[in-house]
């Protein structure tokens, strides 16, 4: 699926401003290294993780444990200041999940504590991106469902990182060569 696109860029010079990313290779540190560097006329992909957080043997998979959600909500209700200092203002916001849970060095918190993640949508960024949407139809949040998943693998985590960091600066297109369940039900977003 990506090889013809790579050919077009490499040999024909077509769309060298676009970045082709093979999601099955995104499981490897050497490929992530390539994605965090500019290529042709395309800037790097928005992956903010330091290499030590994705190198081989690190973040190969992270368990999804939605049973922890109620305990976290209880902590936010009973001790809001301490909870916000620990996990950010929005506990299930994608950026906070990646920062405080997925990339945690503490084994006690190195998991995903929910099966529903959120990305708060910057409506001004969407408008500036040139998307043809009426202002009143831009939702406040994008919902990412992990229902039925026991774990996310490195390629899944990198895809979530791209979504979390992109802020509508560049579009993300995904070729669906496998079932939608492999893409965290992102088909409608």
What are these regions (language model features)?
Residues 3-189:
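ER/secretory pathway lumenal C-terminal domains and tails of membrane proteins involved
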């Amino acid at each position: 699926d990506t090889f013809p696109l790579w050919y077009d860029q490499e040999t024909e010079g077509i769309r060298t401003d676009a970045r082709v990313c093979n999601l099955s290779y995104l499981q490897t540190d050497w490929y992530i290294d390539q994605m965090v560097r500019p290529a042709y006329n395309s800037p790097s992909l928005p992956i903010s993780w330091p290499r030590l957080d994705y190198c081989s043997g690190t973040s190969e998979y992270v368990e999804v444990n939605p049973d922890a959600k109620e305990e976290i909500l209880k902590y936010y209700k009973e001790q809001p200041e301490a909870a916000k200092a620990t996990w950010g203002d929005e506990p299930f916001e994608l950026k906070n999940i990646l920062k405080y849970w997925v990339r945690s060095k503490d084994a006690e918190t190195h998991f995903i504590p929910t099966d529903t993640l959120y990305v708060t949508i910057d409506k001004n960024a969407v408008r500036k991106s040139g998307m043809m949407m009426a202002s009143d139809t831009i939702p406040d949040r994008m919902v990412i469902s992990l229902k039925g998943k026991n774990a996310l693998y490195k390629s899944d985590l990198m895809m979530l990182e791209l979504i979390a960091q992109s802020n509508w600066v560049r579009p993300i297109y995904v070729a669906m060569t496998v079932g939608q369940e492999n893409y965290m039900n992102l088909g409608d977003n």
